[in-house]
Every structure is written in structure tokens, then in C-alpha cells.
């Protein structure tokens, strides 16, 4: 028996395809049994990763492809978003993620720069490989309601 189903999509690295990926991730997540909030988290994280590719990966060439892989398990969804464009230094970028740093002046808050922060906040696991392009691996586990499982034994 198959442990997981794998779906792979390749789209041009263009802004108009971000919504296609959001809809695809939403549909796949609902089939596994994710709740509404977790589906929204998955959509945001996936669209942030795809948007990063659109804005940063193919600056020199102007054209490229995004590969999106989705592994569907009974209890989790793994997303892989990959490009073959410019890589970056993850450790250096990681020090800059987040809405602000406590030592910064509020007047100097920058616009953008929240993509990696959001991905790490909304997903259960995030790994980035920047060897020959950038590949983002993200995992989200299905949250199961514990009360329903033991509802007959609960008394008030």
C-alpha cells in the first residue's frame, strides 16, 4: 500500500500563477482533513514561497519555472517549492526575518521581508536548500480534535 500520494505542478515564475498554487494547495489540504485555519496557513506559506521565487529567483533571465511538489499523507502535507534561479545565504537572511528587531527604530520598519518569517511561523517544519537554486521544504501536520475521540468518557 502506498504511504503517500505525490502531486507535482510546474508553473511559470509569474505573479498570475500564485493564486493557482494557493487554490491547488487548498484543495489538496481539504482532502486530507485539515481544518479551515490550517488550510489558510498552508495557503499563505505556499504563496509566500512562490512569491519569493517570482520576485527573486530569475532576476537576470527574467523567465523561469517554479516546481511545486505536494506529498499527501494521512496525518500531514509536505510542500516543496523549488526554482533554478539565484540562491541566497539562508543563515544571513534568517537573521533579518521578522517584522522588526527590538534594537531598530520604529520609523525604520521596512516593507516586505516577512515571507520566511511567515513560513516558519505558520508551518510545523521548514527547511531550505540553496544549492543550485532554492528549494523550500515545508511540513504541516493535521490537527485532530482530542475531545471527539474521548467524548463518551467526559463528564461534567
Give the predicted meaning of each segment.
Residues 1-8, 54-156:
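Conserved beta-strand-loop-beta-strand hairpin that lines the nucleotide-binding pocket
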Residues 1-44, 148-156:
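Bergerat-fold GHKL ATPase/HATPase_c domain
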Residues 36-61:
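Conserved ATP-binding N-box helix of the HATPase_c
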